[in-house]
Curated annotation (Swiss-Prot):
Belongs to the XPG/RAD2 endonuclease family. FEN1 subfamily. Its cofactor is Mg(2+). Phosphorylated. Phosphorylation upon DNA damage induces relocalization to the nuclear plasma. It is found in: Nucleus, Nucleolus; Nucleus, Nucleoplasm; Mitochondrion. Keywords: DNA damage, DNA repair, DNA replication, Endonuclease, Exonuclease, Hydrolase, Magnesium, Metal-binding, Mitochondrion, Nuclease, Nucleus, Phosphoprotein. Mg(2+) 1 binds at D34, D86, E158, E160. Residues 1-104 are annotated as: N-domain. Gene3D superfamilies: 5' to 3' exonuclease, C-terminal subdomain (1.10.150.20), 5'-nuclease (3.40.50.1010). It comes from Aspergillus niger (strain ATCC MYA-4892 / CBS 513.88 / FGSC A1513). Its main location: nucleus. Interacts with PCNA. Three molecules of fen1 bind to one PCNA trimer with each molecule binding to one PCNA monomer. PCNA stimulates the nuclease activity without altering cleavage specificity. This is Flap endonuclease 1. Binds 2 magnesium ions per subunit. They probably participate in the reaction catalyzed by the enzyme. May bind an additional third magnesium ion after substrate binding. DNA binds at R47, R70, E158, G231, D233. The gene is fen1.
Length: 395
């Protein structure tokens, strides 16, 4: 799930933190990818007539189809992917996972009912809600990656947190995930939409944490508190706290402790905090997650030549993939993994830090932009109000 509406908050209040560009812009870069999030998206997106792809024996193959061709696309564009798989979820996450499982169980029942009585749209809608990544999906994807020569590692708990460790250490350029909570784990750069299909024509979003913090005017701890207020995987949200309210509360009070104190003492009692709301534990999971050091031997990885006969056996003979396409993909892997060894020029130069004057200028421009947006909203609200108060038929 990640952090609710965090992208909206950053795009509106720290627009300089986000760059949108073509996948080709990342040529020669190593990227740590949240494997579980990718597999989940493949199971949802790689479909035929609303149903997941199946082999002749009735086994799901959407995850393998997605993993093979989306990874190929990255390698074709000079990217060197490293997949990171989730370990055991933190205890605090078990409540959220239980809720998700209950929702999926309800969706499964609704899906069966829709197949009997509903429209094609109903069937597809409920079918997507029943999706969950199983151990078998993970095991098969690991087998496929090994045959492709693409490295993977297992995280002790959250994959996004381990991706962030590797990015901070400079072992990879960025962490790639659709989950915005990857920023809470302090990845310097987050890439989104990297594992999307080419047909979707979605640009790759590149989000820089330091620019987001600068634009929001927060330190990392305040940013984490903001994310907890917005709604994260570890806690249920506080009712009536949307993105604008969450941002205002943290800016006004500076920390979750002070925000909760304000809510407690508010005579209007506008906000009701859930009885069991261990925000300190959630904050600790973001600040000090269970991860391996980047220099741990289990975090070593390298790209190798694909095992073509092994790929044919697994994908063609076992899973019913097209043999010519698999062999063609293996040839592209061999060729493009070599060309991705070329270094990017940026690796030879250290980035120049912004001067205080440049920072002040950027902040001024950002503040002006925010003021313009506020002014525009006020004018729109005023025009709406005037239109409502105008008698019907008045020109």
């Amino acid at each position: 799930m990640g952090i609710k509406q965090l992208y909206q908050v950053i795009s509106e209040n720290a627009p300089d933190a986000i760059k949108a560009g073509d996948i080709k812009n990342h040529f020669g870069r190593k990227v740590a990818i949240d494997a579980s999030m990718s597999i989940y998206s493949f199971l949802i997106a790689v479909r035929s007539e609303g149903q997941q792809l199946m082999s002749d024996t009735g086994e799901t193959t959407s995850h393998l189809m997605g993993m093979f061709y989306r990874t190929l696309r990255m390698v074709d564009n000079g990217i060197k992917p490293l997949y990171v798989f989730d370990g055991a979820p933190p205890k605090l996450k078990s409540g959220e996972l239980a809720k998700r499982f209950a929702r999926k169980s309800e969706a499964t029942e609704a899906h069966e009912e829709a197949k009997e009585t509903g429209t094609a749209e109903d069937v597809e809608k409920f079918s997507r809600r029943t999706v969950r990544v199983t151990r078998e999906h993970n095991a098969e994807c690991k087998k496929l990656l090994k045959l492709m020569g693409i490295p993977y590692i297992d995280a002790p708990t959250e994959a996004e947190a381990q991706c962030a460790v590797l990015a901070r250490a400079g072992k990879v350029y960025a962490a790639a995930s659709e989950d915005m909570d990857t920023l809470c784990f302090e990845t310097p750069i987050l890439l989104r939409h990297l594992t999307f299909s080419e047909q979707r024509k979605e640009p790759i979003q590149e989000i820089h944490l330091n620019r987001a913090l600068e634009g929001l005017g927060m330190d990392r701890k305040q940013f984490i508190d903001l994310c907890i207020l917005l709604g994260c995987d570890y806690l249920e949200p506080i009712p009536k706290v949307g993105p604008n309210t969450a941002l205002k509360l943290i800016r006004d009070h500076g920390s979750l402790e002070k925000v909760l104190e304000f809510m407690e003492n508010d005579p209007k009692k506008k906000f009701v905090v859930p009885e069991d709301w261990p925000y300190e534990d959630a904050r600790e999971l973001f600040l000090n997650p269970d991860v391996r050091d980047a220099n741990d031997p289990e975090c070593d990885f390298k790209w190798e030549a694909p095992d073509v006969p092994g790929l044919v056996d697994f994908l063609v003979k076992d899973k019913g993939f097209n043999e010519d396409r698999v062999k063609n993909g293996a040839a592209r892997l061999q060729k493009n993994l070599k060309s991705a060894q070329q270094s990017r020029l940026e690796g030879f130069f250290k980035p120049v830090a912004r001067t205080d004057e440049e920072k002040a200028s950027l902040k001024r421009k950002h503040d002006e932009k925010i003021q313009e947006q506020k002014k525009k909203k006020k004018e729109e609200a005023k025009a709406k109000k005037e239109a409502k108060s105008r008698p019907r038929g008045a020109g």
